[in-house]
Curated annotation (Swiss-Prot):
GO molecular function annotations of the record: ATP binding; serine-tRNA ligase activity
Subcellular compartments: Cytoplasm
Protein name (Swiss-Prot/TrEMBL): Serine--tRNA ligase
Function: Catalyzes the attachment of serine to tRNA(Ser). Is also able to aminoacylate tRNA(Sec) with serine, to form the misacylated tRNA L-seryl-tRNA(Sec), which will be further converted into selenocysteinyl-tRNA(Sec).
Pathway(s) this gene product operates in, as recorded in its UniProt entry: Aminoacyl-tRNA biosynthesis; selenocysteinyl-tRNA(Sec) biosynthesis; L-seryl-tRNA(Sec) from L-serine and tRNA(Sec): step 1/1
Binding, ATP: 264-266, 351-354
Predominant cellular place of this UniProt entry's protein: cytoplasm
Species annotation: Francisella tularensis subsp. tularensis (strain SCHU S4 / Schu 4)
GO CC field: cytoplasm
Keyword Glycoprotein among UniProt keywords: no
CDD domains, A to Z: SerRS_core
SUPFAM superfamilies: Class II aaRS and biotin synthetases (SSF55681), tRNA-binding arm (SSF46589)
Primary gene name: serS
InterPro entries referenced in this protein's UniProt entry, alphabetically: aa-tRNA-synt_IIb, aa-tRNA-synth_II, aa-tRNA-synth_II/BPL/LPL, Ser-tRNA-ligase_type_1, Ser-tRNA-synth_1_N, SerRS_1_N_sf, SerRS_core, tRNA-bd_arm
Domain notes: Consists of two distinct domains, a catalytic core and a N-terminal extension that is involved in tRNA binding.
Length: 426
């Protein structure tokens, strides 16, 4: 959530920045609501002051034995008016809050202005994409998996429906090995604290990180007595651990990681990536979350991104880093880098990680603050998150980049120990 005071003090600038994100901010309506809110607050305070004054008169008259019925009538009249105004004020404040909750984060100054992924800016590349012989072109990961009888989309469709998969045998083992490798790298080399978190979260958590109210259609929600939803990403439960907390500044930064399944309805992506493992309703991810101070936020994004990159480097998978434009960033993000891995079957780079600095946007929603003895009052923390990495997409990248002409898959050196010494999948 944006700072309401900052919005009031910088209306035109806020409107211009929000416009680059495709959000039309109605300044006139916002000002009218603020004017009305001020008027109602002033009227409320005036009536409360009148009531306090009259209440003193009641005490004085009673002490003298005088009649107080006329004064009680005035008090009742004030109470009735207060009841009406307070409800009107509450309804107006709810409307203003809903407007604030619907606003995306303001982009950082160095974020390129653009409409969609075509306006993103490439920052750097790592590794050289493997060249395949024209007579033996790269196969798609789903075709390789089906030939090996280790990826079964038909069985998953029978059990559940489309956009699910069943992994078998050594590819299932490779999937597990990847998550273990990622967790070990981040906890042992990068200093993250590993967490096990709930896969179901309440609405307060989803509001805290920005999934609600705007993206309710993307969630899988439980029916019945529990107001819970399946997590779309571990960012939600991890980041909400600091909701309604005042942290000791000395304990920051905090680096958290967790390996979880993620569940997304993929609303709005009908017809996109219908084949293979690119876009699934259920997938696994190793999430990275940073909780830090405002002065360290931007540099923390560079660090978090480098940690995600290290996974790809250890696996020797070619990739590029893209700085997302204003129109392509996630709702809560202030600045985002996407890591895109090379997929030879598509002859292009595809997203495998999104690393975002959210500033104090989520923290304001969550009331997540920090304080030390030298500070007059607590300040909002800055939150960051990123995939380190999406396990399924990393798996398919390995299948495609390490495929052999005989249909087998070489296991990256970094994973052989996690595979119990298996170096070839065939």
């Amino acid at each position: 959530m944006l700072d309401a005071k900052y919005i009031k003090d910088n209306l035109q600038q806020v409107a211009e920045k929000l416009a680059t994100r495709g959000y039309q901010f109605d300044i006139a309506e916002f000002e009218a609501q603020e004017q009305k809110r001020k008027h109602l607050q002033e009227r409320t305070q005036d009536l409360q002051s009148q009531r306090n004054t009259i209440s003193k008169e009641i005490g004085q008259k009673k002490a003298k034995g005088e009649d107080t019925s006329d004064i009680f009538a005035k008090v009742n009249q004030i109470n009735e008016e207060l009841k009406i105004i307070e409800k009107e004020l509450k309804d107006l404040q709810d409307t203003i809050n809903q407007t604030l909750l619907s606003m995306p984060n303001l982009p950082a100054d160095d974020v390129p202005v653009g409409k969609d992924e075509n306006d993103n800016v490439e920052i750097r590349r790592w590794g050289t994409p493997r060249e395949f012989h024209p007579e033996a072109p790269a196969k798609d990961h789903s075709d390789i998996g089906e030939i090996l009888k280790m990826i079964d989309f038909k069985a998953a469709a029978k059990v559940t429906g489309s956009r699910f998969m069943v992994l078998k045998n050594k590819i299932a083992k490779l999937h597990r090995a990847l998550s273990q490798f990622m967790l070990d790298l981040h906890t042992e080399k990068h200093g993250y604290e590993e967490l096990y978190v709930p896969y179901l979260v309440n609405n307060d958590s989803l509001y805290g990180t920005g999934q609600l109210p705007k993206f309710a259609a993307d969630l899988f929600k439980l029916e019945g007595d529990f107001e819970y939803s399946l997590i779309p990403t571990a960012e939600v439960p991890i980041t909400n651990l600091v909701r309604d907390e005042i942290l000791d500044t000395e304990t920051l930064p905090r680096y958290y990681t967790a390996h979880t399944p993620c569940f997304r309805s993929e609303a709005g992506s009908y017809g996109r990536d219908t084949k293979g493992m690119i876009r699934q309703h259920q997938f696994e991810k190793v999430e990275l979350v940073h909780i830090t101070t405002a002065d360290k936020g931007e540099e923390s994004l560079e660090l978090l991104t480098s940690h995600a990159e290290k996974v790809l480097q250890k696996l020797n998978l070619p990739y590029r880093v893209m700085k997302l434009c204003t129109g392509d960033m996630g709702f809560s993000a202030k600045k985002t880098y996407d890591l895109e891995v090379w997929l030879p079957s598509q002859n292009t780079y595809r997203e495998i990680s999104s690393c975002s600095w959210c500033g104090d946007f989520q923290a304001r929603r969550m009331k997540a603050r920090h304080k030390n003895p030298s500070m007059k009052k607590p300040e909002l923390v800055h939150t960051l998150n990123g995939s380190g990495l999406a396990v399924g997409r990393t798996l398919l990248a390995i299948i495609e980049n390490y495929q052999q002409e005989d249909g087998s898959i070489m296991v990256p050196d970094a994973l052989i120990k996690y595979m119990g010494g298996i170096s070839v999948i065939k």
